[in-house]
Amino acid sequence: MPPHFIDGEPHDHQHDRPRRVRVAGEPVRIGIGGPVGSGKTALVAALCRQLREELSLAVLTNDIYTTEDADFLRRHAVLPDERIAAVQTGGCPHTAIRDDITANLDAIDDLIAANPPLDLILVESGGDNLTATFSSGLIDVQIFVVDVAGGDKVPRKGGPGVTFSDLLVINKTDLAPMVGADLGVMRRDAERVREGRPTALISLTEDPSSGPALEWVREQVRTLADVHQ
């Protein structure tokens, strides 16, 4: 796998998590998880706005009892309505992305059938704690989003999402002075617990493109699907 470039630094970490067996021509699937309020849906919206002119993409959201996140994306017209789908998990949000992924797989099949050909599907989990991870049978790579508002201790606390995601996004860096968070400490702690896996610090307020997270997604599509722009 080519090295990741996050904040200008190369990363060539070979991940230990088993990979989904991909079929030629299938869209790349990227999971986006993280706690409630960390900015997952805002990141999905930013990625859609930046990528919709260069890739054929769709979004699948997960909510417990509503379709709120999908409705938000439709209201903001980040993609045509038929490219946005929702799964109502009806219970713990991590169950639908890790333990019983049937509803998500069915929804992905429907998106692929309705929007051929797709290059990329973003799968957003429902809000959960630091333990949520995606099944490797559902997605190819996963992003985990935390935010600065929780304080600079969040990366240090670890958890499967923080430690083992393919990309850790530390969001809302513009709030650091207001909550007394040290971004240098957060970066250092993330690098320590993640053992070389890349971390991106972003502020969608200051850079609506999502900066390094966007470039990482582009790299994954190029690497996994051989989509050349």
Curated annotation (Swiss-Prot):
- Tell me the Gene Ontology biological-process terms attached to this UniProt entry: urea catabolic process
| Basic and acidic residues compositional bias, start-end | 1-15
What terms describe the molecular function in GO for this protein? GTP binding; GTPase activity; nickel cation binding
Arranged from A to Z, the UniProt key words for this protein are: Chaperone, Cytoplasm, GTP-binding, Nickel insertion, Nucleotide-binding
Q: Region (Disordered): which ranges?
A: 1-20
> Which residues bind GTP per the record?
34-41
Q: Known InterPro entries for this protein?
A: CobW/HypB/UreG_nucleotide-bd, P-loop_NTPase, UreG
Predominant subcellular localization, coarse grouping: cytoplasm
A single cellular component GO annotation: cytoplasm
**Domain of life, per the record?**
Bacteria
Where in or outside the cell it occurs: the entry states: Cytoplasm
**Stored PANTHER family:** UREASE ACCESSORY PROTEIN G
Q: What the protein does? A: Facilitates the functional incorporation of the urease nickel metallocenter. This process requires GTP hydrolysis, probably effectuated by UreG.
Oligomer status and interactors? Homodimer. UreD, UreF and UreG form a complex that acts as a GTP-hydrolysis-dependent molecular chaperone, activating the urease apoprotein by helping to assemble the nickel containing metallocenter of UreC. The UreE protein probably delivers the nickel.
NCBIfam families the UniProt entry points to: ureG
In the record, the note on similarity to other proteins reads: Belongs to the SIMIBI class G3E GTPase family. UreG subfamily.
Which HAMAP family does this UniProt record tie to the protein? Answer: UreG
Name the chain's protein: Urease accessory protein UreG
UniProt organism field: Rhodococcus jostii (strain RHA1)
